[in-house]
Amino acid sequence: MRHGDISSSNDTVGVAVVNYKMPRLHDRAGVLENARKIADMMIGMKTGLPGMDLVVFPEYSTQGIMYNEEEMYATAATIPGDETAIFSAACREADTWGIFSITGEQHEDHPNKPPYNTLILIDNKGEIVQRYRKILPWCPIEGWYPGDTTYVTEGPKGLKISLIICDDGNYPEIWRDCAMKGAELIVRCQGYMYPAKDQQVMMSKAMAWANNCYVAVANAAGFDGVYSYFGHSAIIGFDGRTLGETGEEEYGIQYAQLSVSAIRDARENDQSQNHIFKLLHRGYSGVHAAGDGDKGVADCPFEFYKLWVTDAQKAQERVEAITRDTVGVADCRVGNLPVEKTVEA
């Protein structure tokens, strides 16, 4: 893991993250103009960072937040589509992989159902190699239709990459899911605003440490007329230490080199802090001393997760018993979310 240079090597993946200024757009023409601006920025960055293998732009950086519902549906894109064609051309010209936001991506039943909040990973040949749909939209504000799975893709120089989006990152489960599928770099694209800056910076660092993985965060900056976005895009080592972090500046960039061999060596040879290994080999020292085998205990000890998998409805009811049983809150209503209990069919 190295920071401070503009290079990369056969063993290091040069990763850049961008504090892209949150755009305020209203129509397809504006979206496509902004997509071309992102493409131009990427190509320019490659000149300044010749070692750059991967560049990451924030959530909402392409379309902005459409606060008008009609505009949200009217600007919802297809994948592939006009926006992705612009990004693919830039990836080819810059000979660089890119991660871009599509908010939203048309639902299969468009326009009868809300769009998805989607990230795409495009390789240096211009091919879309991963499409991730946000699993945990930022309720109650975000009205995106939720996705249902994470992915791992072999990226530049073989580094294994997963994508997550903004509020996804507040749930340890999604990080663990990516890591246990083999992700070595988890990319978190955000359109995160104040007041939750400190919590979000802390969460990404903690999850890098807990999952023995690299983390790259790209967050929006600026004010879009509604929210103020705190930036602080960052690249974090698999030991939880920050390699590089921007401030709040619009269009700020950070860059670091992530060693492929170093993370694989750590996962194979580290012991006391090898969290992903130890989780599935619980208490192996004591189990071995007892003569009960040399693998520790693999069984899941967490009753909640067992219940969630075997009876999701009962798990939901258990959560409601310690929180609330409606999605809306009577004392602070948001939209038309119900504040009286409803029964699902």
UniProtKB/Swiss-Prot annotation:
InterPro entries: Aliph_Amidase/BUP, Aliphatic_amidase, C-N_Hydrolase, C-N_Hydrolase_sf. Residues 13-260 form the CN hydrolase domain. It catalyses: a monocarboxylic acid amide + H2O = a monocarboxylate + NH4(+). The active site is at 59 (proton acceptor), 134 (proton donor), 166 (nucleophile). The keyword Hydrolase applies. GO terms for molecular function: amidase activity. The keyword Nucleotidyltransferase does not apply. It holds the Pfam family CN_hydrolase. Belongs to the carbon-nitrogen hydrolase superfamily. Aliphatic amidase family. Homotetramer. NCBIfam families: PRK13286.1 (NF009802). HAMAP family: Aliphatic_amidase. This is Aliphatic amidase.
